[in-house]
Amino acid sequence: MAIHSLQKTQKINLSISEVWDFISSPKNLKEITPDYMGFEIITDLPEKMYAGQIIQYKVTPLLNIPMSWCTEITHVKEHEYFVDEQRQGPYKFWHHQHHIKPIKNGVEMLDIVHYQAPFGIIGELVTPLIVTKKLEEIFEYRFNKLIQLFGEYKEG
């Protein structure tokens, strides 16, 4: 079965420190996740993210069926990137890289997600119709929410 990938970029007129502080705090995930996902963090979270950190959530990704999701923060390079990997949850495979880099008048965020649906060939068949479509919706929501929070990016 194939591992699929999705890449999304967004530019924000904030400093690298401001963007890092926002994206590296798991507490902000709920704010940039659509309400219909029923996203709830179960884990008590420290102020700072660290490699090896385990975060447990409840989500409702499809058909209003609540699921547990557990991710591990596997890599952290402050003000540059972090990686979360699913340890248990709705995907057979989930690897999400969050990169940020300084650009003129702000920061460019790059998300790279590699994922695979469960259920073998059935999961593979529904991936483009349901899974990829749902991920696109979630990232579109996040894109618009970040504009709402921090404004439209302006180069000059």
What are these regions (language model features)?
Residues Q86-E137:
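Beta-strand/loop substructures that line and gate deep hydrophobic ligand-binding cavities in soluble
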Residues I16, T74-Y81, H99-E108:
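A short, structured loop/turn motif at beta-sheet edges
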Residues I12-L14, P61-L63, H75, P90, ...:
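Beta-strand elements of well-folded, non-transmembrane domains
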Residues M1-P46, Y50:
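Hydrophobic ligand-binding cavity/cleft-lining segments
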Residues S5-Q7, P66-C70, K92-H96:
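Short, surface-exposed coil-to-beta transition loops
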Residues E40-Q88, Y141-N144, Q148-E155:
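Glycine-rich portal/gate segments that line the openings of hydrophobic small-molecule binding cavities
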Residues T9-N13, E40, K58, E72, ...:
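Generic structural detector for well-ordered beta-strands
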